[in-house]
């Protein structure tokens, strides 16, 4: 499969706004990006969505039956519904009929399907979800991982997260020399719980990881770090808190601006600024999180994703495929491969 024409399997039935917004984002991606899109799901619903967006061009549809609902336990759901859209999409990658999967559906089901269908990369004990957030420096983002795949971690897992994050930052985000930090309660090497202390020692000894020290919560969005490593419990809380703060900030601006600068006139003048602020803070701009460490490219988008977010998720998938992120991770892990033993 050529790097300039990646084939992306899109779970058309996953997400709060499926299939309409999923299809809309996929159609735009096919038109504007050098990708082939395979829409996976109910053919009738997908055809209806394509027609709704006045798109008469032929698009490849891969039939699937059903979806893993949000209330379902992930592992039992994917085993009970082998023809569910996320399972079919993952199988396309496994069988080399697609290069990547994009899904805004049940994130737990997507992770479980990826592990069962694609498997882990050699040398990776626990895959991680990487999420990209904006920073105070315009045009610069920070990659945080893990943000939900592993609530309990060992130091060795965090070392692997740091390796994967370094590669992602270099080849997908375009950072020549990523600065990697360990999320902690203080900058000093002696700070933190047992996991943080032992992880710090491992990271500073690994010459493949450009580790620069601990990152406090206030540093996350400062632009000081390109990659921040933490366990999935802390990372998930951090991610959702950051999203909530962004939404609150935008809402406050919407409410307060009409009260000053002569009301509606002032608001109209500031609309371009507000649009730029929203663009910098909106998670839709980054498309979703890349599940790093599985034998394939898998983008897990926000459940509330609409067309712009799906478009960006497909763009992200294409970049990961074109830059051979999975192969680069596997090559790096060969150089530091050590079995995980109790306590590490």
UniProtKB/Swiss-Prot annotation:
Keywords: Cytoplasm, Lipid biosynthesis, Lipid metabolism, Phospholipid biosynthesis, Phospholipid metabolism, Transferase. The keyword Nuclease does not apply. Pathway: Lipid metabolism; phospholipid metabolism. Its main location: cytoplasm. Its EC number is 2.3.1.274. Signal peptide: none annotated. PANTHER family: FATTY ACID/PHOSPHOLIPID SYNTHESIS PROTEIN PLSX (PTHR30100), PHOSPHATE ACYLTRANSFERASE (PTHR30100:SF1). This is Phosphate acyltransferase. It comes from Cyanothece sp. (strain PCC 7425 / ATCC 29141).
């Amino acid at each position: 499969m050529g790097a300039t024409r990646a084939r992306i399997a899109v779970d058309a039935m996953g997400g709060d706004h499926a299939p309409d917004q999923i299809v809309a984002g996929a159609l735009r991606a096919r038109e504007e990006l050098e990708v082939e899109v395979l829409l996976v799901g109910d053919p009738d619903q997908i055809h209806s969505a394509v027609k709704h967006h006045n798109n008469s061009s032929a698009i490849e549809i891969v039939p699937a039956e059903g979806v893993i609902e949000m209330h379902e336990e992930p592992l039992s759901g994917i085993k009970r519904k082998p023809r569910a859209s996320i399972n079919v999409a993952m199988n396309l990658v496994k069988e080399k009929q697609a290069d990547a999967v994009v899904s805004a559906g049940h994130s737990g089901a997507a992770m479980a399907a990826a592990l069962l269908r694609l498997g882990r990369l050699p040398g990776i004990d626990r895959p991680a979800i990487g999420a990209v957030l904006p920073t105070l420096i315009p045009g610069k983002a920070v990659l945080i991982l893990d943000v939900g795949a592993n609530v309990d971690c060992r130091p060795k897992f965090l070392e692997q997260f740091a390796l994967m994050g370094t590669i992602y930052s270099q080849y997908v985000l375009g950072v020549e020399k990523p600065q990697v930090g360990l999320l902690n309660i203080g900058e000093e090497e002696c700070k933190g719980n047992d996991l943080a202390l032992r992880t710090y020692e491992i990271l500073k000894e690994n010459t493949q990881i450009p580790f620069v020290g601990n990152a406090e919560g206030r540093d996350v969005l400062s632009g000081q770090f390109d990659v921040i490593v933490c366990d999935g419990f802390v990372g998930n809380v951090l991610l959702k808190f950051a999203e909530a703060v962004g939404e609150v900030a935008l809402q406050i601006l919407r409410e307060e601006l009409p009260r000053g600068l002569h009301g509606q006139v002032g608001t109209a003048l500031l609309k371009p600024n507000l649009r730029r602020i929203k663009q910098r803070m909106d998670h839709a701009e980054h498309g979703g999180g890349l599940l790093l460490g599985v034998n394939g490219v898998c983008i897990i988008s926000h459940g509330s994703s609409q067309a712009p977010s799906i478009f960006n998720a497909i763009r992200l998938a294409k970049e990961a495929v074109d830059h051979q992120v999975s192969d680069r991770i596997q090559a790096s892990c060969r150089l530091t491969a050590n079995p995980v033993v109790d306590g590490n």
